[in-house]
Amino acid sequence: MALSDVDVKKQIKHMMAFIEQEANEKAEEIDAKAEEEFNIEKGRLVQTQRLKIMEYYEKKEKQIEQQKKILMSTMRNQARLKVLRARNDLISDLLSEAKLRLSRIVEDPEVYQGLLDKLVLQGLLRLLEPVMIVRCRPQDLLLVEAAVQKAIPEYMTISQKHVEVQIDKEAYLAVNAAGGVEVYSGNQRIKVSNTLESRLDLSAKQKMPEIRMALFGANTNRKFFI
């Protein structure tokens, strides 16, 4: 039986409604999928940026911590150097004061003569040369001549060697020197300095650990002494 125009129109309308519904469902499906993919991508981007921000601030934090350590180390070193300089300055001042006090020794002729006797003999025994020259301050000439005359027989007794000792009357130690003598080999290539200043410096060098211990106490950072 042939369809009437009304039936045809109904079928067409029904088919169009079906197609439209299917199209709408498809569009909704596409929209839902697109939104899902968008949300996934957005989440990925947000997470990526969050990680980048965290990484940036972690790096900054490490840099700040490193700079802090460097600054603290620098400050500790500067403080340590400042303490060392202050300690060295104190020791230098004490040695300078000790050198000034050496002048008191020469004020007593008897004490100074006994000291010169020992310094001259010690200088001769350290060189052990057949010919030696003794140099002194000009104001000590007579005292040193007496010390040399006393030292020669003592030297020969100890060393079992003959010796010729000359006193240098052309070159002297400085007038403002503390005192003592310098002893030279005959060719003046070898010298033993037995001035009061040099003996003080040598004694201070040898006793420096004890001096530092007395002034500043034990060094807790040092595990052993050399």
Curated annotation (Swiss-Prot):
GO MF, one term, reads:
proton-transporting ATPase activity, rotational mechanism
SUPFAM superfamilies, A to Z: V-type ATPase subunit E-like (SSF160527)
Query: Which InterPro entries would you find in this protein's record?
Result: ATPase_E_C (IPR038495), ATPase_V1_Esu (IPR002842)
Q: Which domain of life is it from?
A: Eukaryota
GO biological process terms, alphabetically, are: regulation of macroautophagy
In what tissue types does this protein appear?
Testis specific.
One cellular component term from this protein's GO annotations in UniProt: proton-transporting two-sector ATPase complex, catalytic domain
Q: Does the keyword Ion transport apply?
A: yes
Query: Which key words are in the record?
Result: Hydrogen ion transport, Ion transport, Transport
The function of this protein is: Subunit of the V1 complex of vacuolar(H+)-ATPase (V-ATPase), a multisubunit enzyme composed of a peripheral complex (V1) that hydrolyzes ATP and a membrane integral complex (V0) that translocates protons. V-ATPase is responsible for acidifying and maintaining the pH of intracellular compartments and in some cell types, is targeted to the plasma membrane, where it is responsible for acidifying the extracellular environment.
Query: What PANTHER family would the database entry show?
Result: ATPASE H+-TRANSPORTING V1 SUBUNIT E1A-RELATED
Family, per entry = Belongs to the V-ATPase E subunit family.
Q: How does this polypeptide assemble, per the annotation? A: V-ATPase is a heteromultimeric enzyme made up of two complexes: the ATP-hydrolytic V1 complex and the proton translocation V0 complex. The V1 complex consists of three catalytic AB heterodimers that form a heterohexamer, three peripheral stalks each consisting of EG heterodimers, one central rotor including subunits D and F, and the regulatory subunits C and H. The proton translocation complex V0 consists of the proton transport subunit a, a ring of proteolipid subunits c9c'', rotary subunit d, subunits e and f, and the accessory subunits ATP6AP1/Ac45 and ATP6AP2/PRR.
Report the protein name in the record.
Answer: V-type proton ATPase subunit E 2
Give the originating organism.
Homo sapiens (Human)
What is the gene name?
ATP6V1E2
